[in-house]
């Protein structure tokens, strides 16, 4: 059983609120979950304290048990200083594709 800490959408249409939950990765996004750890309200200003509310003791306990935070939750945990988020590395991003490389060579010759 792969356990993840992720966001489950709640709220009404065009007014989202997200619950931070611990769930099995096979469960639906807004469906069954094991435990609710807090909430996130993206409509509030970034400097508002009520924008993100987490029970840090529960979060630390679940991370210690091996729960993997989703990308967005890992950003929250990094900002709170709970778990360091490793930077993404994509060395192939700057390499031009074959078609672009051929076009550049043709333009250089022509």
From Swiss-Prot:
GO biological process, one term: translation
Alphabetical list of Pfam families matching this protein: Ribosomal_S16
Region (Disordered) residue spans: 79-110
GO terms for cellular component: cytoplasm; small ribosomal subunit
GO molecular function: structural constituent of ribosome
Gene3D superfamilies the record matches: 3.30.1320.10
Matching InterPro entries: Ribosomal_bS16, Ribosomal_bS16_dom_sf
Keyword vocabulary terms for this entry: Ribonucleoprotein, Ribosomal protein
Keyword Ribonucleoprotein assigned: yes
Keyword Protein biosynthesis found: no
Superkingdom as given in the UniProt entry: Bacteria
HAMAP family (alphabetical): Ribosomal_bS16
UniProt similarity note: Belongs to the bacterial ribosomal protein bS16 family.
Protein name listed in UniProt: Small ribosomal subunit protein bS16
Source organism: Bradyrhizobium diazoefficiens (strain JCM 10833 / BCRC 13528 / IAM 13628 / NBRC 14792 / USDA 110)
């Amino acid at each position: 059983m792969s356990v993840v800490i992720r966001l489950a959408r709640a709220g009404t249409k065009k007014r989202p609120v997200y619950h931070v939950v611990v769930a099995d990765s096979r469960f639906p996004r807004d469906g069954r979950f094991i435990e609710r750890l807090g909430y996130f309200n993206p409509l509030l200003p970034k400097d508002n304290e009520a924008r993100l509310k987490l029970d840090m003791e529960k979060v630390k306990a679940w991370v210690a048990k091996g729960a993997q935070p989703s990308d967005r939750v890992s950003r929250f945990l990094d900002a709170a200083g709970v778990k360091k988020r490793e930077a993404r590395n994509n060395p192939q991003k700057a390499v031009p594709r074959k078609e672009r490389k051929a076009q550049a060579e043709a333009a250089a010759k022509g």
